[in-house]
Amino acid sequence: MQFQRRSLMIFLLFIGYAIVYIDKTVVGFALLPIEREFSLQPEQLGYITGVFFLAYSIFQIPAGWLNDRFGFKKVLCSSLFLLGGFAMCFGWLGFTFGLLLTFRFLAGMGHAGYPTSCAKAVTANFPVEQRTFAQSILLSSAGLAMTLGPLVAVYCLEHIGWRGSFASLGILAFIISGCILWLVPNPQRTLPVSSPQQQSVPYRQLLKSPIVILLFIAIFCLNIPSYGLMAWLPKFLVQNRGLPLGVSSLVAAAGGLGMWISSLCTGYFVGKYMQGKEHKVVCSCSLLSAVCIGLVYATSSAISASLFLFFGYVFLMASFVSVFTLPMKRLPTDVMGAAMGIINTGGTLGGFVAPIAMGYLVKMSQGYFSTFVFLVVVMIVSGLVILPLAGKTYSPVREAA
């Protein structure tokens, strides 16, 4: 019975995560018709994507506190409901550049609670030895979304337009939110917090932890190429490499497939064979991913680009899963929402910086060479910054309690 309950919860959280990632995937392809409709400059397109992650970053830590205070189920449902509502507004009411920015910002605010509440749900319902695999299943939804998302996005853009695509996505988010509300059991009650001062102590100590800081930087660097490619790869392939939109969706889908496979395999492999050696996994995979990302730019063949992007995302996701699951092994449950909020804020800041920085680089250089150099460099940094964790023994009781 417990296995069935956990399986149902993971399935629903997985579908919700997929909706969240499809929302971010569709934007990259929707920028092409949006650019034509509003006659936008490259840096303005970057802001449409980046402002989503700005809101995501701002509300990430408050969302972690809400998880610790009110429970993961309420935050899960609220996040999907807000994300769906503002996705619909983006499609139906986004008639000016300012409104597009506003609705994407508000959607990012809604999205902020979902990753931390999923991490809280996994921590509360799974033993330590199963958490890496359970979380990797949820993170693999990114691969599913990036595999099917480009294909679905191009189909929807061609048949119902970018406005109808976002409206449909919002309806799906509403449906999944209702299913979670109805089918996922309520979390066990914990003792109420007696005062704000008592709750603030773990936050201050977590912010001083060198391990939390290093994980924050690593996630920041890893998400720059992840979200930067998600936002700009379709435009690069169509306008710079001259590929049809349908072919560019297949190239992007190859990267998503690599991400999906890697997230599932990495969770099992690291959880079973590489306990305590995660820094080696992160460093080696980050360097290999940097090489593959550089080769995506160097090739002019759609098949070669698909192959390099596939392996680039295989190694990138291996690094990401290893970094993202480390706090679940080292931190106590009562501060998990807060810790994941802090660390994941690094990732969302990477998502904010990446599309805007790439937009300015494209405009200033009138090309994409400098943008890919930027992606390669931050990928290398993500691997090197994790090396100081080698040999460290982290005690959550001493550092975070």
Each model region followed by its residue ranges:
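Extracytoplasmic gate region of multi-pass secondary transporters
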Residues: 27-28, 210-264, 320, 324
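Cytoplasmic membrane-interface "Motif A"-like loop-to-helix N-cap segments
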Residues: 69-80, 271-286
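C-terminal transmembrane helical hairpin of 12-TM major facilitator-type secondary transporters
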Residues: 276-323
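Helix-loop-helix hairpin linking two adjacent transmembrane segments in secondary transporters
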Residues: 137-184
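Helix-to-loop junctions at the C-terminal end of transmembrane segments
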Residues: 60-71, 263-276, 362
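C-terminal ends and interior cores of transmembrane alpha-helices
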Residues: 81-95, 287-300
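Cytoplasmic helix-loop-helix junction between adjacent transmembrane helices
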Residues: 103-144
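Juxtamembrane intracellular "pre-TM" segments in multi-pass secondary transporters
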Residues: 1-3, 187-215
